[in-house]
Design a protein with these regions (language model features):
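HAD-like aspartate-dependent phosphatase fold
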Residues: 1-238
Length: 238
């Protein structure tokens, strides 16, 4: 039976661990929500364990470094995990061996963003190709500048013909552009398109089990029934 609550205080005694989404739950991309900042402080006073997970395509150090500017104390969180971090670790260390001899990468990202190339730091053993025909895997982080989903079909067809695997660093389908409040597609939309075409897609962010399991590794002897995940999207968080 669904229960509608007015405040986190209504259920705080039922859980020991709180897993929090970032965008839309804690902040709007620019400023932390006052109610979220206050709720985090209250949870800490109640000795609750707090974890942040995000479908950001960036590595987790980026999310950690932003917390202070958004009004949060980074020391309140025992772990911060992003889908980008999960994918970076997988590509770097081949944890699950999703592909053989992955060396040549076609990197989808917005080159107009100052930090667009930061994801490549530490991936020096890989060749980053400008043509998908020269790649044996795709790293999908953020959409190319001024593109729409239909623009990716030729790229995906070429990749599909050669069984190229796609690693999706941000599995969200859409986000909201804060300046004009417009919906913008994320790489989850492109990954879903490739999947429906028959391509192999690796997603380790929400709502997959992997990111939840990884983020909870720093907690010992916890009861799964006393973990609460808080998000703002049924498609992205559940």
């Amino acid at each position: 039976m669904k229960k509608i609550i007015d405040s986190i205080s209504d259920i705080i005694s039922l859980y020991d661990v709180f897993i929090l989404d970032q965008w839309g739950v804690m902040h709007d991309g620019y400023n932390g929500y006052e109610h979220a900042i206050n709720s985090v402080e209250k949870l800490i006073k109640e000795n609750k364990k707090l974890i942040i997970i995000s479908n950001s395509s960036k590595r987790k150090i980026s999310s950690i470094s932003r917390l202070k500017n958004l009004g949060f104390n980074k020391n309140h969180f025992i772990e911060v995990m992003t889908s980008g971090e999960m994918i970076w670790q997988e590509i770097s260390h081949s944890i699950h061996n999703y592909g053989n001899n992955l060396k040549n990468c076609f990197h989808i990202f917005d080159s107009s963003q100052e930090d667009g190339l930061e994801f490549r730091n530490g991936l020096d053993t890989f060749n980053f190709e400008s043509n998908v025909n020269d790649a044996n895997f795709i790293l999908a982080c953020t959409p190319f500048e001024n593109t729409e989903p239909i623009d990716y079909i030729p790229i995906l067809k070429n990749a599909l013909d050669r069984d190229v695997v796609m690693f999706c660093a941000n599995p969200d389908f859409v986000t909201i552009e804060q300046n004009n409040k417009k919906n913008m597609f994320c790489m989850g939309t492109i990954a879903d398109l490739y999947d429906h075409m028959g391509g192999k897609v690796i997603i380790l962010g929400k709502p997959s089990n992997e990111i939840y399991e990884e983020s909870c590794k720093k907690i010992e002897d916890f009861d799964h029934s006393r973990i609460l995940a808080i998000g703002d999207s049924l498609d992205h968080d559940i």
